[in-house]
Amino acid sequence: NINNSGLTHSDPLDGSPQYMHFTTKNGDTRTFQYGSRATNPIDQWPDPDIYTHKSSGQTLSGSETRNLNRCYPGVEDGTLSEQVAYAVTNMIKTLDIDMEIDLHESSPEYAVNNATVAHERASAIASEGVLNLELEGISMSLEPSPVSLHGLTHRELGDYTNTYALLMETGNPSQGRLRGYTDEDLVKTGEDPCY
């Protein structure tokens, strides 16, 4: 998680576990913190009634101001979320990073699921990747990055840097609204009787 503030909380009413534990081949236990992609309200408050994306002027619900994936390419002296997005954009430019893949999980009922979303400059690479996954028996669709929806990594990093910008979205019931009890097992296995 590139937004450390997001690791300090979970989304309201989600009841997500705070940590996940994995046992390695040699028997050691590795612990990973589990949080939200949204900046903790303690670190960025209050939410405005309407969030205005700085570089495009697009308006969204006020709570989206803390959603990192609505803040790209970022603002150097903006909110914490906008500063994190700016730092990522600046790092990609400074290091001349060729390709970035933003990994997401979504609820199984989400419309864009098991999909690769590609900026138009990255569509050839994404097409080949999706085809290779399909040949391996992994179902994946290809979606174009919407030109008119701003703040998203695959749109803004593709527009504001030279990187090939991609996002991969996979479904996991631990993100779903219809799930049952949420624990470490559900997060790791993605198995829930409600799905």
PLM features: residue spans?
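Active-site/substrate-binding loop(s) of hydrolase catalytic cores
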Residues: 2-120
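C-terminal accessory segments enriched in acidic
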Residues: 76, 80-195
